[in-house]
C-alpha cells in the first residue's frame, strides 16, 4: 500500500480500535503490520522536519504503533540470564537476525541493549546497554550511551550524543500530541531528561542533570527571555533556579551562552568509536 492508503486504513482502524484483536485479519492487520515495518526500516517516520525547520507529525503512524499492541498476544521471549526470558507482545528489532542482517544495518549494538520492533536505527549508530522504544528514530552517527533510554516515537538526529542515563520521553503514556525531538549535532549531558514533546534544536548542548518538560522555564541569561518547550539552536543549557513566591526558588533551565569552539572541543564526536 502507498502511504496515503496506509493512512486511510489506519485511521479507519483507529476508529474501530476496540474491535481489533490478535484474531484480526485482512486489510486492517496488513496496514498495521506494513506501517510498523516501514517505521522499522526508516522508510516512514512518526515526525519529519520540513525545510523551514518545523516538524510535521504523522499522527496516523503513531496510531499504528498503538494499534500494534492490539494484534499480538503476550508470549514468552527467550534470551534472559540463566535461561530466563521475558513476557511481552512486542518483538525485538533483532529477532531472527544473522550476520548478513547486522552488516546491512550498519550500526553497532553492544550486549544488553534493547531495541523494540518498529524503531529505526541508522548506520553508524552505537548502542551501548540502552533502551530504544518502539516507533523511535535514531539517525546516523549517534551514540546512545549506557542506560540511556529513547522513548516511544522519539526522534534523534544525526551525530547526537545521549550520555549515560539520559531519558528522552515517549508519546504513548501519558499520551502526547508530538514526539520528543533532539535535532542534529546535539550533546545531552548525563542523567538529563527531555520529555513531553519538547524540542532541542540543532547543535545545542545540555549540561549534566538538565530536566526539560513543557512546563519547564527555559531562561536566556543574556536577555532574560523565558521560553517553554523548545531549546534554540546552538544553546548551552545548564540547570538553574528562579525566585518564586515567598522566597522559594524553583527549578529552571538556563541558556548560559551559545556554543563556541571550546564547547565543541569538549562535546565532539569521536569518529574512532564509529568505525
UniProtKB/Swiss-Prot annotation:
It is found in: Cytoplasm. One of its GO terms (biological process) is lysine biosynthetic process via diaminopimelate. Pfam families: Hexapep_2, THDPS_N_2. Disulfide bonds: none annotated. It catalyses: (S)-2,3,4,5-tetrahydrodipicolinate + succinyl-CoA + H2O = (S)-2-succinylamino-6-oxoheptanedioate + CoA. GO terms for molecular function: 2,3,4,5-tetrahydropyridine-2,6-dicarboxylate N-succinyltransferase activity; nucleotidyltransferase activity. It is an enzyme of class 2 (transferase). Pathway: Amino-acid biosynthesis; L-lysine biosynthesis via DAP pathway; LL-2,6-diaminopimelate from (S)-tetrahydrodipicolinate (succinylase route): step 1/3. Keywords: Acyltransferase, Amino-acid biosynthesis, Cytoplasm, Diaminopimelate biosynthesis, Lysine biosynthesis, Repeat, Transferase. HAMAP family: DapD. This is 2,3,4,5-tetrahydropyridine-2,6-dicarboxylate N-succinyltransferase. It comes from Dinoroseobacter shibae (strain DSM 16493 / NCIMB 14021 / DFL 12). The gene is dapD.
Amino acid at each position: 500500500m502507498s502511504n496515503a492508503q496506509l493512512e486511510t486504513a489506519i485511521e479507519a482502524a483507529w476508529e474501530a480500535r476496540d474491535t481489533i484483536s490478535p484474531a484480526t485479519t485482512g486489510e486492517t492487520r496488513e496496514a498495521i503490520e506494513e506501517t510498523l515495518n516501514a517505521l522499522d526500516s526508516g522508510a516512514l517516520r512518526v515526525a519529519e522536519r520540513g525545510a523551514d525547520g518545523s516538524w510535521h507529525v504523522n499522527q496516523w503512524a503513531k496510531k499504528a504503533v498503538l494499534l500494534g499492541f492490539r494484534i499480538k498476544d503476550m508470549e514468552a521471549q527467550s534470551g534472559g540470564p540463566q535461561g530466563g526470558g521475558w513476557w511481552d507482545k512486542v518483538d525485538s528489532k533483532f529477532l531472527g537476525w544473522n550476520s548478513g542482517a547486522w552488516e546491512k544495518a550498519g550500526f553497532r549494538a553492544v550486549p544488553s541493549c534493547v531495541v523494540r520492533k518498529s524503531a529505526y536505527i541508522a548506520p553508524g549508530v552505537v548502542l551501548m546497554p540502552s533502551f530504544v522504544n518502539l516507533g523511535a528514530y535514531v539517525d546516523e552517527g549517534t551514540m546512545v550511551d549506557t542506560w540511556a533510554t529513547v522513548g516511544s516515537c522519539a526522534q534523534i538526529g544525526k551525530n547526537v550524543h545521549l550520555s549515560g542515563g539520559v531519558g528522552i520521553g515517549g508519546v504513548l503514556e501519558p499520551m502526547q500530541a508530538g514526539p520528543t525531538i533532539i535535532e542534529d549535532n546535539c550533546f545531552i549531558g548525563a542523567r538529563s531528561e527531555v520529555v513531553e514533546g519538547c524540542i532541542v534544536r540543532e547543535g545545542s548542548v545540555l549540561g549534566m542533570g538538565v530536566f526539560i518538560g513543557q512546563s519547564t522555564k527555559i531562561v536566556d541569561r543574556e536577555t532574560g527571555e523565558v521560553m517553554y518547550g523548545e531549546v534554540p539552536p546552538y544553546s548551552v543549557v545548564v540547570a538553574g533556579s528562579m525566585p518564586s513566591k515567598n522566597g522559594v526558588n524553583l527549578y529552571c533551565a538556563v541558556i548560559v551562552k551559545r556554543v563556541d569552539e571550546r564547547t565543541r572541543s569538549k562535546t565532539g564526536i569521536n569518529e574512532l568509536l564509529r568505525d
